[in-house]
Every structure is written in C-alpha cells, then in structure tokens.
Amino acid sequence: MLALVIEGLVMLGELSKAAELYPHAREFIGTGAVVLWPVFRFTQTTAGIAASAAHQWEAAEEHFQIAMHQAEALPDRLEQAEIRRFHVMMLLDRAAPGDRDKAQMLLREALVTYTQIGMPRHIEMVQSLLK
C-alpha cells in the first residue's frame, strides 16, 4: 500500500505529503524487502519517488540507480520504464545543468518500452513529459 500512496500523492502533485512518507519507504528497504506487493513496485523505486518529493536529490538518485540495477538483474522491463519515468520527473524538478538532456534520453528509453508492452496511457504521460 505504501507504494500506491506515495506514487498517487506524487501524481496528484501532493509532494509534501509524499515526502513525509520517505522515512517509511527507507524502513521497508531496511527490512531487506525488494518488492512491495500487490503493485510489484521495487522498494528502491518507491524510496526514490519519496526522496524526490522531499527534494533529497542525492538520495533519490541513489535509490533510482539501485532500483534500475535490480530491475535489470531480474529482469523487469516494466519496472525499468517506471524507474526511468519517475527519475525523469525528479530531474525535471531539480533542473540542474544537464538534467534536461538526461531526462530526454531516459524518456525516449521509457517510451520504447511502454510502446512495446502496449501501455497507451503511459505513452501519453511520457510524451507529455517530452514536450
């Protein structure tokens, strides 16, 4: 449920509320859990989303990087695309030098996966971020 709440709050623009849940996301990682059920969202992805909402950029980058390594090792193509999408949202929010270029690359990669899997709503979300 935590993953759904954090992701939902971020998608609704309630970043401060999602940020408050970051300590709980870190607790899940501390238990050794890798995936949250029933949404099959990686704990590191969830922590990255919450850290992004809290503007803890370095922590978010680390969580997304670990999550991507896990998703590639499993492999889980859908989670890879989701990690990229949420990482992009963090990069666009942070807006540091080079972030926009990196975001564009990640979005193109996510778009390929969403297209191959056949996820039209996610394709729309990625295309709106590309603009």
What is the role of each PLM region?
Residues M1-K131:
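Helix-coil-helix junctions within alpha-helical repeat/solenoid scaffolds
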